[in-house]
Amino acid sequence: MPTLKTLLLVFDLCGTFVFALSGALAAVRRRLDLFGVLVLAFAAANSGGIVRDLLIGATPPAAIADWRYGAVATVAGLLTFWWAPLIEKLKNPVRMFDAAGLALFAVAGAQKALSFGLDPVMSALLGMLTGIGGGMARDLLLTDIPMVLRADLYAVAALLGAIIVVCGDALGLPMAVVAVLGATACFVLRMLALRRGWQLPTARGARKS
């Protein structure tokens, strides 16, 4: 079985890659240049993890201290810049990659918070924050309303994945199994919400701008 440190690194780097793809592809769609694509890739890939590490006192943040995070984001950005037409053939690629990154980071964030001694409630909330941070940074840099502030199930999916991790830890279940279950639950809920139009309620009588 992998150690907690190894598992966190794997989930962090995988989440970094898929979130970088979502950021880079969103940048390509806005016709940003190569530098802009790489900036969006890095911001989407690492913002959530940097915020997580700063909040729990893991300094310097892993995304800054470990060259692999920047390298993974750069590779994802370059791949997207040169092969965007191939990636666009997937159905809703930005949202699919975003859902995958959301799931991986929510799980990794909750696990790292637990490893730093945070209580279960705060660990679950920090896992959610880790998951939504990259998408928020991407959307804000593109002057979009962040997905997490819209009605669709975004933060809720991240929170579900983080809660599964926290509960699994409390029950003493194998961390690898719990991580996979949490990430899968988050990803499935997010994709189902997109496919079926599941949304949180909005204020009655609110006008669309």
Regions from the PLM with identified roles:
Residues 3-16, 42, 61-75, 119-131:
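Structural signature of hydrophobic alpha-helical transmembrane segments
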Residues 20-30, 53, 78-91, 136-147, ...:
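C-terminal ends of transmembrane helices
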Residues 1-7, 54-64, 108-122, 167-178:
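Helix-coil boundary and interhelical linker segments in multi-pass alpha-helical membrane proteins
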Residues 74-112:
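Ordered, amphipathic secondary-structure segments that act as subunit-interaction surfaces
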Residues 1-46, 50-59:
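N-terminal topogenic module of multi-pass integral membrane proteins
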Residues 39-43, 50-56, 125, 129, ...:
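Short, structured motif recognition centered on aromatic/hydrophobic residues
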Residues 35-43, 66-71, 91-102, 124-126, ...:
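Cytoplasmic-side transmembrane-helix entry/capping segments in multi-pass membrane proteins
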